Amino acid sequence: MVTYLLANFGGPRTSQEIVSFLQALLTDRDVTGGMIPSMLHRPLFSYIAKRRAPHVARQYAYLGGGSPIFQDTERLAQNLSQELQASVIPFHRYLPETHRETLQALQESQGSIVGIPLFPHYTFAVTGSIIRFFLQHLPEKPISWITQFGVHPEFVSCMQQHIRDCLAAQQIAVEDCYFLFSVHGLPQRHIRLGDPYAQQCQASFEALRGELEGKIAFQSKFGIGKWLDPSTQEVCQSLRTKKRHIVIVPFGFVSDHIETLHEIDHLYVPILLQKGYRVVRIPAINASSRWVSSLAAIVRSSPQETSLEPLLMP
C-alpha cells in the first residue's frame, strides 16, 4: 500500500493568516539562511514578516483576501487520489495551521510514502525545505521523493497543449506570439552551493519552447545579493519584437497564486501594454483539463529519491 504526499507552497486562506504565512516563509533558513548569523535569523525575519504584512495584505486583497493555492491543492489531491486509486495527503509548506493534520495523517498511514512536491524544478530552497521538514518532524516515517519533473514528457506535452488551448480560446495564432517563459528566481549563491535549479529550468524551457520564439526570465526577487538573470521585469522593459502578442508562461508554477495573479498582472503586464503589445498570461498548468492524468503518469513513471542528504542545502 502506498500513500502519496502532495506538497505545495501553501498560502494564506484569509487575511488573518498572512502574518503566520510570512513568518513561516521568511524564517525558513533554506529560504533566507546565509544572509545573517543564525542567532539573529529568526527574530529579525519574524520582525520583517510583521512589517511586510500590511503591504502583502494589500496584494492579497486583489485576490479576494487570500490565495487560491490552498483550495487548488486540496482539490488536486482529491482528483489525484481518484486517478491513482490511492490515498493522497496534501501538504502546505508555509501554512503552519495545517501541519498538525498532515503529520497525523501520515503517522497513521500504512505502507510506504511517496512525496510529490508540486515544483517542476528542484531547488534547495523549496523542495529541499519540504524534505527537511519531514526529516525533522516525522523521522520515523521514511519518505521517497519525486524531486523534479520539468522535462518529463507528460509535463512538457501537457504544458504545450495547455498553451495552445489558451491561445485558441482567444483566437490568437501561435505564429503571432512572442513567448516569455517566466520562472521564480533564485539567489546565485544557491547555485554556487550546487543547487541544480538554474540548469533544470533551462532544460525545461528548451523542451517547452520547441519551435516557439521566446526566452526565459526569472521573477520574484527579494532581499539582497545577485539573483539569476535576466529578470522578468528587465526582459519586459527591453523587449523588442514584431510579434503583436506577448504570451507570459509561468511554467515553474503549477498553481496560480500571488506571484502569477498579482505580480505578473500588476508589475509586468503594464510595462508591455505601454509599449503597445497585446499581452496574454497563460494560467498555471493546474487549470489544464489534462493535468490530473498527466501528473498521475508522472508519479507512476518517475524515479524516487531515497538518499536525501545530497538534496538538502549544505
Curated annotation (Swiss-Prot):
EC number: 4.98.1.1
Name of the gene: hemH
UniProt-listed Pfam families: Ferrochelatase
Binding sites annotated in the UniProt record for Fe cation: H184, E259
GO cellular component: cytoplasm
An example Gene Ontology biological process: heme biosynthetic process
Catalysed reactions listed for this entry: heme b + 2 H(+) = protoporphyrin IX + Fe(2+)
Primary role: Catalyzes the ferrous insertion into protoporphyrin IX.
Entry keyword annotation includes Cytoplasm: yes
Transmembrane segments: none
UniProt keyword annotation of Iron present: yes
Family named by the database record: Belongs to the ferrochelatase family.
Main localisation: cytoplasm
Pathway annotation: Porphyrin-containing compound metabolism; protoheme biosynthesis; protoheme from protoporphyrin-IX: step 1/1
Gene3D superfamilies hit by this protein: 3.40.50.1400
Record-given protein name: Ferrochelatase
EC class name: lyase
Gene Ontology MF, one: ferrochelatase activity
